[in-house]
Amino acid sequence: MCRIRHGFVEINQDGRRRSRQNPDMQKIPFIDSHTGGEPTRVILDGFPALTSPTLAGRVAELQSQHDHYRAAVCGEPKASEITVGALLLPPITAGSVASVIFFNNVGYLGMCGHGAIGVIATLQYLGRITTGVHQIDTPVGIVTCALHGDGSVAIENVPAYRYRHNVDVAVEGFGTVCGDIAWGGNWFFLVDANEHGFGREHIPALMTFARALREALGRQGVTGKDGAEIDHVELFGKPSTSEYDSRNFVLCPGSEYDRSPCGTGTSAKLACLAADGKLAEGAIWRQESIVGSVFEGSYRNAANGITPTIRGRAFMCGEGSLLFDSSDPFQWGIR
């Protein structure tokens, strides 16, 4: 087998990196960032080769044949449960700078707003891009990103829309809860829940309510379009200051909460505001997260909804290699 040597690492013909000092130890290089407090782990190399011509096909291939890589990258003991992974791949579409597959501790994401901001900031850190407009390929479509001189990134997300309005759900212990179903790159159930309180001290109570609500959605067959699972719950309350328009708490698919205001969740919120006539096209909506970070959102009208733009900033916070020791019983995560 052909091997290319780089320092203490050998790159096998299959593209997988292994330590020259310990050939049984595989290495996967990564860069960590956070966007508004929510981590993104960009995987630079080391995953098995994916051969499908489409990005959706590559997601299916990764899920069916190599899912243990996802579990290891985003789960204990190599990561915390809130880590979102972003597998960096060559672009599929002409003009794109990269393709990205997003995933977390339980599965795969069609799109991730904070993650896309993290990917663009990471590409700048690596010297692959400079300020300006760039596009990345995601499983749900092309996402256009503007990297600004101050380090912030504005992403023009995939089209968003409200699917159903004022949907009643019976939630055990909480009675009837009314909310909207909207698509912002992922499926959301959005609820005005200010009565639960929106300080950091209320996080445990918000978590209990959001989990109970999501369980009720599943039991009662409340879904997105074409029966799609609603795997995100987004609760809204009053912001901490009049500088912002709203504060949110977002329950993610892995039953952890988003530290950022959630890019796809803010996109879904903008779709609902637009449908209700509460936010004009081009106007700025400042969405605060439960930990106090802020995204700026706006939209332009589209044929079947809106095209949202979300602006935030990511910060680099780690760089290295994940090590996979064949003698480690948890090398692929605690499963």
Could you describe each region identified by the protein language model?
Residues 12-24:
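Short, Lys/Arg-enriched N-terminal segments with co-localized hydrophobic residues
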Residues 24-182, 189-335:
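A glycine-rich beta-to-alpha transition motif near the start of alpha/beta enzyme domains, typified by
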